[in-house]
Every structure is written in structure tokens, then in C-alpha cells.
Amino acid sequence: MTYFTGFILILFAIIIKRLTPSQSKKNIVLIANAFWGILLVGYTFNEQYFVPLSATTLFFILAFLFFFSMTYILIARSGRVVFSFGTGFIESKYIYWFAGMINIISICFGIILLYNNHFSLKVMREGILDGSISGFGLGISLPLSFCCMYLARHENKKNYFYCFTLLSFLLAVLSTSKIFLILFLVYIVGINSYVSKKKLLIYGVFVFGLFALSSIILGKFSSDPEGKIISAIFDTLRVYLFSGLAAFNLYVEKNATLPENLLLYPFKEVWGTTKDIPKTDILPWINIGVWDTNVYTAFAPWYQSLGLYAAIIIGILLGFYYGIWFSFRQNLAVGFYQTFLCFPLLMLFFQEHYLLSWKMHFIYFLCAILLAMRKALEYE
């Protein structure tokens, strides 16, 4: 049944491509449905390692994607509007200088932290996770770096583009988090208005290479790497891709529990005294077959709050939000924020990056505003 559902989503993605606006460079509905179709087909071939997905779980995923897609199409086809703050007044050079300064400061702090942890990214990562090591401004420096990558590509300033691409990559590596590496790759792909099949294959190999390198450096494997390093890397990739689905399925089947009011965690300072809100966003571990996981997809906190209705309500809300943004006429600011919006949608299989990551959305939106206020060059 899982295989059939995945096949239906892939077929739906092909059909829906005909219904979405042809002028949209980033066909977000096609990406979402094709990705989930491939993911579910992949789960079928790896089901011996995980729990089988129930009909309720598959229905929830199908319903969410259907209502998201239909709402998006209705909004995006209604017309193209302009996102603008009028005539820009900030010269590009000041954006480059400001972002460059913030990036260099952030990298210096990151290197100091790495030095204090004996140049071990693994030890540094453990310190960041347990709170004994504070961050080094990645939440601001990385979006600014992506912002300048986008700007430099638009202005055809190759030296600036390569410089900020390198800075972004260094920041993503120093973060010790695969999340920031994925964000880096989303922007590398999103900057290009057209990606050939050959480039897509190269990006895929590059993604796998970064994933493997990250696992080796951090020593994070789902099976014993001793003498079987390639097998251990594939096992780790298997867990990252499919464990959230398995855990969500167990939660739907009432074989797992989550802390109450999980979606309110970012607002614990506001409602912490009136509601029972978790003190941490780290979820409980659960056995999913061969392995354990504490990742439950983005669907779990939605399902906790709204039950099966979450597929309809949140599907419509996100479809409306994405439809609005992807109905704007293409410009620098819109393209930058559209690219960011691809990230939380792709990461649904892993964890929630909307309400639980509202600060991230706010920072990237501010960067989009910064690009909107940029003074256009004479030839534009």
C-alpha cells in the first residue's frame, strides 16, 4: 500500500505540473509531490528495517499534499502581483560589506570554539546540543551570506558570488549541523533559474558526499562503521530519510507519546506559566524496528494539536501562504524568500520548520526586505 501511495503521488506530481503557472521557475507543488512520492516508494524498499505504515498515516500524508496543492494552484493561478518597497536606496556595496563583516566575525568565533574543543567538530557538536557551548551568530550570518550570494549572482559579480559561497560553506560546516548544510545546498540549487539533469545528478552526488563526510567527521553512524564504512553511511542515510515516518506512524497508532503542547514550545516564555509547555524541543526516543529515533516528522506536532483535521487545515494554510508568495512577480527579494520556503517544505519528512522555527522565517524575511530596498544598478 505504501508503494501504491508513492506511485500515486508521483503520478499526481506529473498531472499537477500542467495546472501550475508555467512562468513559475520553482514549481513547488511538483517538487513536494514528487519528493514525497519517491520517499514513500523508497520506504517500501526499506520496510524490513522499519514498521509498516498504516492506512491512517498514508491517508494523512495524501490529504495534506492534496489540500496544499489545490490551495496553492487556486491562489497562484489567480494572478501575478508585485512585491516592492518602491525605489531602493541602499547601494549593493554596503550590503556586501555589512554581510562580509558579520560573516568574518562569526567564522572567527566558530574557529575559536573549534580550537577550544581541540579541533574536534564532534566534541563541539555535543557541546552545542547539550547547551554547554553557545552559538556564534549563525542565525544571522548565514542568511546574510545567502542574501549576498543571490545578489552577486543577480549583478553578475562572480568574485563576490564565489567569496560568499565559500563563506556560506564554511559557516555551514562550522555549525556541525546537517540542517545548515541542506540550507546551503537549497540556495546553491535555488540560485539557478534552470537546473539541467546533469547538474541535478552532480548536486545529488555532492549532497551524498557531504552527508558521508559529515557522518565520518562527527562519528555519527546508525551501524558499526568498523570495516564497513560504506554500509554504515547508507544505514545512516536510511535512518535520516525514513525514521521520522516510522515514528510518526507509531504516534498515529498510539504506540508513542509526545510532550503536550509541542507547537507552543517557541512561546514558552509567553505562555509557560499558564500552559503545560515542554522545557525542551528534544523529543523522546522510540524504537522503530532495527533502530531508535527521536525524529517524528513535521506531521506529529500538527497531528497532536488537530488530529486528522491537521492535514486539511494546515494543508490549506500552507497552500495559501506558498500560493501568495509564488504569485508575486519574480524579482530579487521574492526569489530569495521563495528559495528559503523550499527548505521547510522539503524538511517535512524530518521535523517541523514553520511554527517551531518562526525566528528563522523572520530573519530570512528581513533579508528579503533588505534586497527589496537595494538601489538598482543603472543597467537594470
UniProtKB/Swiss-Prot annotation:
Reactions catalysed, as given in the entry: n lipid-linked O-antigen repeat units = a lipid-linked O antigen + (n-1) polyisoprenyl diphosphate
GO biological process: lipopolysaccharide biosynthetic process
TM region positions: 1-21, 27-47, 55-75, 94-114, 132-152, 169-189, 201-221, 229-249, 282-302, 306-326, 332-352, 353-373
Membrane topology: Multi-pass membrane protein
Coiled-coil ranges per UniProt: none
Keyword Cell inner membrane: yes
Official protein name in the record: O-antigen polymerase
Organism, as annotated: Shigella dysenteriae
